[in-house]
């Protein structure tokens, strides 16, 4: 069993999913966002370098427009993302300001991190912001992202985006907050006897088999996308934790070594 004390992690990427930001009734969960901002501000005050990868643009757009179901058409999704992203950043800036924490926005597309020159520029931007103790709030630039045969600009989901960012900035730790307590041996929403897997050192068929399923009606990511992201972290020798984001201050407990969620690391 790996030592769970993660206090040595200096550079941390936190990914929060739509389900942690939007209530089941479609309303924005301001209480959770406030707790998240309080927690991440506290980490910066402890001399941690923190990057927040935040989903939720489409979900906030849905709430803003009074809609309850994510549309299937790409133009509608991108229009909602345009509405929701600006509102989401306004909420983040207001909440972080309550704790005297400065923030910034970085909207990425896949090709930005594919081409060496643009990749170097954006990673330099991350490093400068972290040096200034500013928290970058990262999302995919959903309004322009496409996924075509000859031109891919979409990451597909923010679980993978968070892993790409963690890799690019050489983070020590990735924390993915979701609507589930961690990785289970089978879907806990369907099976009452499902057991939490507390530690994973290799992504094999057994793990990928346990990770079947899709995301919430407001988001895109399911467990399979999270496992893909965790596989990258393990292969790069980085640590990652998958935990429930219902109470974002759980991050403090994770760093202090409490047995929460699933820890992914190289053996």
Curated annotation (Swiss-Prot):
Keywords: Amino-acid biosynthesis, ATP-binding, Cytoplasm, Kinase, Nucleotide-binding, Proline biosynthesis, Transferase. One of its GO terms (molecular function) is ATP binding. SUPFAM superfamilies: Carbamate kinase-like (SSF53633). It is an enzyme of class 2 (transferase). Its main location: cytoplasm. It comes from the Bacteria. Its EC number is 2.7.2.11. It is found in: Cytoplasm. It catalyses: L-glutamate + ATP = L-glutamyl 5-phosphate + ADP. Catalyzes the transfer of a phosphate group to glutamate to form L-glutamate 5-phosphate. This is Glutamate 5-kinase. The gene is proB.
